[in-house]
Curated annotation (Swiss-Prot):
Protein name: 3-isopropylmalate dehydratase large subunit
Pfam families for the chain: Aconitase (PF00330)
PROSITE patterns: ACONITASE_1, ACONITASE_2
CDD domains per record: IPMI
InterPro entries: 3-IsopropMal_deHydase_lsu (IPR004430), Acnase/IPM_dHydase_lsu_aba_1/3 (IPR015931), Acoase/IPM_deHydtase_lsu_aba (IPR001030), Aconitase_4Fe-4S_BS (IPR018136), Aconitase_4Fe-4S_dom (IPR036008), IPM_dehydratase_rel_enz (IPR050067), IPMI_cat (IPR033941)
Pathway: Amino-acid biosynthesis; L-leucine biosynthesis; L-leucine from 3-methyl-2-oxobutanoate: step 2/4
Role this protein plays: Catalyzes the isomerization between 2-isopropylmalate and 3-isopropylmalate, via the formation of 2-isopropylmaleate.
Record key words, sorted: 4Fe-4S, Amino-acid biosynthesis, Branched-chain amino acid biosynthesis, Iron, Iron-sulfur, Leucine biosynthesis, Lyase, Metal-binding
Assembly and oligomerization: Heterodimer of LeuC and LeuD.
Swiss-Prot/TrEMBL GO biological process terms: L-leucine biosynthetic process
Cofactor note: Binds 1 [4Fe-4S] cluster per subunit.
Catalytic reaction annotation: (2R,3S)-3-isopropylmalate = (2S)-2-isopropylmalate
Gene transcribed to yield this protein: leuC
């Protein structure tokens, strides 16, 4: 029977499927961080258990770490407790830890792939909703809750219902300057923030195949923002080229065998999806959100929506509420919207390709008066590479702040947060009310769009001179 990519990975990981019950699937990689793991480790201790497969568990510190200092003294009391607790738990249970002093420390969804921990055909879980990022490699990756984190620690398995399948095809090629972030925001704009609910989405089409691994990770990262359980892209030569030689990638004869196996990880001809969506790549312009969820998005040359144009009262009410919160007027040109904060970073857009794209717009320019802009590399390796290329100097010469790796301003959990009334051009993944700080307004954009907004002081169409 013809199978989709998701069905192939799922079927190969089902341990047992009792009649009338959710199947139990095997987990190949378990990623943990300081925020969602303490209670799970405690549960394992109380039960008198050990970790089932500590060698398949990888930990880092990212959500609550400081991006201005690697010292524990820079952390709040709560953050310090979380960081120190993770260190103690990893030592006690034999888990590999990339702490704040490790050269490879970084955002879990950045450092996992760059170390080769993420591999095609595997099942990967983490106590973080953006675990879908790893699906860019043809892995089945999704976020889990703290009780499930404990279950995986104890058994290396998870009870899961099988999801429905959705194909999202982006046909043709994008215009010059259009990025993976624009593609995925356009997708969410088309199907809505709940259009993928109940599905595992496979992204395909010429525009997806043309993306680098960094770009594919951006797309899969935001699968959760369309409501999907996970997002996947079939592995190909681009995938193998990225993974070859990385620390945890197969070596020698095992590498050849792995690549041969990965070549089979594609949806069979004739496989049937439960739902399908098609976009024409050439129609995608630079995107940015205007409201309070990722589905409230428009192209840079479009206007802030008018509630009176809504198709029903529910949509009208949603638009009205969002406009009130973000303090925008219907009919406003997005290029007339000013910003005072810029954040370039997060597990969506903090890789070397993202920083290079942003640096193009920062080079030889200055951050506009009244704007604070920070650049936060996603990992120690990204930071090292960027500095070797001189990107840090381009940013600092332009007036951007160059920071240490971490989740930073993506969420109002650490010291990098917005104040009430701030309006931020952000390369992160969520623009919910208060996401970056109580009373703050977030506009999701690509790294290039964020850097351009920083120097202009307002959103600009990067396809035109500014």
């Amino acid at each position: 029977m013809a199978k989709t990519l998701y069905e192939k990975v799922w079927d190969s990981h089902v341990v047992v499927a009792p009649e009338g019950e959710a199947p139990i699937i095997y987990v190949d990689r378990h990623l943990v961080h300081e925020v969602t793991s303490p209670q799970a480790f405690s549960g394992v201790k109380v039960a008198g258990r050990q970790l089932r497969a500590p060698q398949k568990t990888f930990a880092t510190m990212d959500h609550n770490t400081s991006t201005t200092s690697a010292s524990l003294d820079a952390l709040s009391p709560m953050a310090r407790t979380q960081v120190e607790t993770l260190e103690q738990n990893c030592k006690e249970f034999g888990v590999r830890l990339y702490d704040i002093h490790h050269k490879n420390q970084g955002i879990v969804h950045v450092m996992g792939p760059e170390l080769g921990i993420t591999l095609p055909g595997t099942v990967i879980v983490c106590g973080d909703s953006h675990t879908a990022t790893h699906g860019a490699f043809g892995a089945l990756a999704f976020g889990i809750g703290t009780s499930e984190v404990e279950h995986v620690m104890a058994t290396q398995t998870l009870r899961q219902l099988k999801a429905k399948t959705m194909k999202i095809e982006v046909r043709g090629h994008v215009a010059s300057g259009i990025t993976a972030k624009d593609i995925v925001l356009a997708i969410i704009g088309k199907i809505g923030m709940d259009g993928g609910t109940g599905y595992v989405v496979e992204f395909c089409g010429e525009a997806i195949e043309a993306l680098s691994m960094e770009g594919r990770m951006t797309v899969c990262n935001m699968a959760i923002e369309m409501g999907a359980k996970a997002g996947m892209i079939a592995p190909d030569a681009t995938t193998a080229e990225y993974l070859e030689g990385r620390e945890f990638s197969p070596k020698g004869e095992s590498w050849s065998q792995a690549v041969a196996a990965w070549e089979q990880l594609k949806t069979d001809e004739g496989a049937v999806f439960d739902a399908s969506v098609v976009l024409d790549a050439i129609d995608i312009a630079p995107q940015l959100t205007w409201g309070t969820n990722p589905g409230q998005v428009v192209a840079i040359d479009q206007l802030v929506p008018n509630p009176l144009d809504a198709t029903n009262s529910t949509v009208r009410s949603s638009i009205e509420k969002a406009l009130e919160y973000v303090d925008l007027t219907a009919g406003t040109l997005m290029t007339d919207v000013s910003i005072n904060k810029v954040f370039i970073g997060s597990c969506t857009n903090s890789r070397i390709e993202d920083l290079r794209a942003a640096a193009v717009h920062a080079k030889g320019r200055k951050v506009a008066d009244g704007v604070k802009a920070i650049v936060v590399p996603g990992s120690g390796l990204v930071k090292e590479q960027a500095e070797a290329e001189g990107l840090d100097k381009i940013f600092t010469d332009a007036g951007f702040e160059w920071r240490l790796p971490g989740c930073s301003m993506c969420l109002a959990m650490n010291d990098d947060k917005l104040e009430a009334g701030d309006r931020c051009a952000s390369t992160s993944n969520r623009n919910f009310e208060g996401r970056q700080g109580r009373g703050s307004r977030t506009h999701l954009v690509s790294p290039a769009m964020a850097a351009a907004a920083a120097v202009a002081g307002h959103f600009v169409d990067i396809r035109k001179p500014y």
